[in-house]
Amino acid sequence: MLDITEIKKIIPHRYPMLLIDRVEELIPGEKAVAKRNVTINEELFNGHFPGNPVMPGVLIVEALAQTGAVALLSLPEFKGKTAYFGGIKSAKFRKVVRPGDSLRLEVTLEKIRNNVGLGKAIATVDGKKACTAELTFMIG
C-alpha cells in the first residue's frame, strides 16, 4: 500500500488536483487500485451542486487517470516523468458519487509501447460501477 507521501513521489499532482488518497494495490506496468474518500469539505461542492452535492464525472475520470499514472510511472524507465492524457474513450457514468462515498479506482494497463500506455478503468462505490472508461496515456 502507498500512502499520500509515497504517491507524491510518483505523480506530480498536488492539492487541489491530487485526487487519490492511497494506493491499495500496485503491480508496476500492469495494474493499480486506489481509493478516494469523497468529503463535503471539498470546495467544488459549493457549486456542484448547491443542496445536491455530486462529484463531477470529469474528476472521477481524472482520479482514474492518476491511478493509471501511478501504475505506469512506477516502472523504472518512466521514473520522474509525467503521464498526460492521450485520450478518453467510451467513458460511461452509471452512479452518482456523493460526499461520504469511498471511491475505488482500478486501472489495468493493457498495452505499453514506447511512451504510450492504454488501460481499462473502473470506478466503483460499494461494489457498484460509478464510471468506466478506456484511457490513453502519453509519457513525457
From Swiss-Prot:
A GO BP term here is:
lipid A biosynthetic process
Could you list this entry's UniProt keywords, alphabetically sorted. Answer: Cytoplasm, Lipid A biosynthesis, Lipid biosynthesis, Lipid metabolism, Lyase
Write out the GO MF terms: (3R)-hydroxyacyl-[acyl-carrier-protein] dehydratase activity
Q: Which GO terms describe its cellular component?
A: cytoplasm; membrane
**Matches recorded under Pfam families:** FabA
Active-site residues are H48
| UniProt-listed Enzyme Commission number(s) | 4.2.1.59
Its recorded reaction(s) are: a (3R)-hydroxyacyl-[ACP] = a (2E)-enoyl-[ACP] + H2O
**Its principal location?**
cytoplasm
Report the subcellular localization. Answer: Cytoplasm
Q: Which InterPro entries match?
A: FabA_FabZ (IPR013114), FabZ (IPR010084), HotDog_dom_sf (IPR029069)
Q: What does this protein do?
A: Involved in unsaturated fatty acids biosynthesis. Catalyzes the dehydration of short chain beta-hydroxyacyl-ACPs and long chain saturated and unsaturated beta-hydroxyacyl-ACPs.
Tell me the protein family, please. Belongs to the thioester dehydratase family. FabZ subfamily.
Name the PANTHER family on file. Answer: 3-HYDROXYACYL-[ACYL-CARRIER-PROTEIN] DEHYDRATASE
By what name is this protein known? 3-hydroxyacyl-[acyl-carrier-protein] dehydratase FabZ
Q: What is the lineage of its organism?
A: Bacteria, Bacillati, Bacillota, Bacilli, Lactobacillales
What's the name of its gene? fabZ
